């Protein structure tokens, strides 16, 4: 990238949901364009429609662009993609699903071309986006198919980072989808992300159990003894500071999670329910990929769409997180490419034990 400011792509999501509202509210502050160059992918007609529904938000002015390559510093670029004739707030329609996918594909096209530094995705409706050409159960799976790497869904905030072993699958399939090998791989991915994406020096990871009371020694399920604990032992042998398995209720209710830099949950709701309770304005980050993708941690919220009631803070945080992660990756790449700088760092840390290292990200 030749420009100093990062170019961050933002997709409209479902034009009948709250995507446009939170985008417009988040970008209304002129300081945002001082921080980065926004490139919005979506329907100009939907943008104009929702701009007129916001009573107390400063109107956002767009600069039309054919792609992110035409985006300019100090301007909010709008790449026309996923056009709709007339938004229908609160309605789940095939037209809105198509528009969400078209905007997403345009952003990923520019991301893969190197014209964007990261992408922030607006929420779409998982049912209406389905078609013969798009059969993914979520953004995470789509980005995993389009970009290099094995994606991991990490929910993150200033106080908490939760990774998932399984994502968008039925509860009935969770137990058979968990294996020792997968948990070890996911622990490695989570550790690498905590180091490279969040700047944690020597991350400690809590691993959640699958069954109530962590299986009670096998009385309430054998997964802890036969799968999860052996995975933790193997990962620890590889230098990953993984601990557990911990019963979910005890880990969160007692505040034990604060002693760890990351948490690995076995399934979607096990991780997201406590995360959203503790961090209502958190961010969804897709780790394990060559490129950076984040999103707000809420859905389309059809019930309040078009009513000027949506809170933009999670969208703001998703933008901030994308910027921070890109900067962390570049800083680490620069450091690891400089042998003298790396040698000095290693020398200064030579006599430091694990217990002396920072246990949380202090930034």
What are these regions (language model features)?
Residues 1-139, 181-266, 270-284, 289-300, ...:
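Contiguous, glycine/small-aliphatic-enriched amphipathic segments in soluble metabolic enzymes
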């Amino acid at each position: 990238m030749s420009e100093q400011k990062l170019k961050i792509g933002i997709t409209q999501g479902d034009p009948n949901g709250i995507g446009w509202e939170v985008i417009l509210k988040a970008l209304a502050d002129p300081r945002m364009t001082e921080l980065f160059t926004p490139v919005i992918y979506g329907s100009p007609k939907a943008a104009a429609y929702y701009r007129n529904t916001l009573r107390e938000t400063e109107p956002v002015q767009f600069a039309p662009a054919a792609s992110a390559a035409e985006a300019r510093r100090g301007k909010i670029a709008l790449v026309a993609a996923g056009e709709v004739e007339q938004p229908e707030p609160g309605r789940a329609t095939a037209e809105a699903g198509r528009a969400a996918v078209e905007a997403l594909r345009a952003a990923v096209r520019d991301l893969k071309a190197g014209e964007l530094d990261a992408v922030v995705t607006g929420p779409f409706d998982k049912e209406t986006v389905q078609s013969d050409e798009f059969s993914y159960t979520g953004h995470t799976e789509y980005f995993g198919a389009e970009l290099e790497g094995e994606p991991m869904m990490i929910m993150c905030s200033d106080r908490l980072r939760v990774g998932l072993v399984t994502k968008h699958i039925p509860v009935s399939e969770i137990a058979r989808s968990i294996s020792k090998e997968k948990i070890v791989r996911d622990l490695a991915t989570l550790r690498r992300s905590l180091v490279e994406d969040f700047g944690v020096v020597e991350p400690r990871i809590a691993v959640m159990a699958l069954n109530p009371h962590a299986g009670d020694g096998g009385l309430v399920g054998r997964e802890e003894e036969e799968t999860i604990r052996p995975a933790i032992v193997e990962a620890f042998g590889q230098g990953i500071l993984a601990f557990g398995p911990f019963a979910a209720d005890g880990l969160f209710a007692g505040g034990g999670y604060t002693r760890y830099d990351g948490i690995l949950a076995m399934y979607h709701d096990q991780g997201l329910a406590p995360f959203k309770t503790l961090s209502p304005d958190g961010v969804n980050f897709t780790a394990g990929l060559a490129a950076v993708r984040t999103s707000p941690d809420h859905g389309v919220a059809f019930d309040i769409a078009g009513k000027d009631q949506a809170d933009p803070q999670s969208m703001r945080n998703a933008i901030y997180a994308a910027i921070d992660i890109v900067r962390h990756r570049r800083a680490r790449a620069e450091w690891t490419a400089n042998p003298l700088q790396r040698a000095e760092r290693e020398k200064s840390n030579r006599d430091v034990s694990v217990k002396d290292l920072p246990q949380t990200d202090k930034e």
